[in-house]
């Protein structure tokens, strides 16, 4: 979703989900190539063209991936549970401390989005994003019943 969003303020806007439907979902359903120009967060504009030729499987990841535009077409929906502090720490480690204020605002917006879209309740599988028992992800997975 980060490549579809268009900046912090427009990330969960109706335009985002319209673009998502037109650029990703519609071509996928029509067995066509997916084409869009991804958003560059540092330049604050769309820059690099992306082409995915007729994918048989597509994983869409991110906060907005639980929107109805995607959800109704998804064959499997995952919910990853992670403590807010751990989540923001991971993002700041990846993207830098300079986005800390935007991330605090984003967490409020994503929480509202999750509630409005019943994201957690509509998921097929829940995954612990910070398990107490560490696993070797190269050879193990954990399955639980909700």
Task: Report residues per predicted region.
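ATP-dependent NMP and nucleoside kinases share a basic, alpha-helical "lid"
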Residues: 46-94
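Amphipathic alpha-helical transducer elements in NTP-driven molecular machines
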Residues: 17-21, 60, 81, 100-103
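NTP-dependent small-molecule kinase module
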Residues: 72, 76, 93, 97, ...
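Conserved protein kinase catalytic core
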Residues: 6-8, 67-68, 87, 134-136
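Anionic group-transfer/hydrolysis microenvironments
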Residues: 4, 63, 130
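Conserved catalytic-core segment of NTP-binding enzymes
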Residues: 80-116, 123
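Conserved nucleotide-sensing/catalytic segment adjacent to the nucleotide-binding pocket
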Residues: 1-58
